[in-house]
Amino acid sequence: MDSEQILAQITEKMPTAILSTEVARDGILNIHTSREQIIELLSLLRDDAQLGFNFLTTLNAIHFPENAGQELGVIYHLHNWQKNVRIRVKIFFPKDDAHVPTATNLWPTANWMERQEYDFFGVVFTGHPDLRRILNLDDLEVFPMRKEYRIEDGTRTDKDDRFFGRDGHVGRSFE
């Protein structure tokens, strides 16, 4: 089963589900859809005898702060074991409205994956049976994997080259 066959099957049964597609450098088909159609599309991919993507390898959230109105996203990595085919299904949405329907009704293993993405990115999986932080403290008010925070403390001086007898080099400046 190749990308064209997968897309033909989806388009035949859900003509408006696919917003765009691309084949990544690793050869895996990426399908972009909407939040409103994600569960129906995932159900089709899992339950259709021709498609048979019965295994949710993982799901992860991503944050692109430069994409206004689509800053956050969730990517579902699916695998058809019988045909050894993998695909990714992606959805994007505003960070101010970070709600996505849960996939735990389709794959119970999505439970902990969704909890992790809630914990690190703040994506709320609507209908999740136990959506709470999984690794961070319950009273943490931020989502640490979002690209909204400095990577290092700007007041640190222990990594300043001037303290090691180096003046810096071309293309590098010191504040």
What residue ranges belong to the model's regions?
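Terminal low-complexity/charged segments
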Residues: 1-175
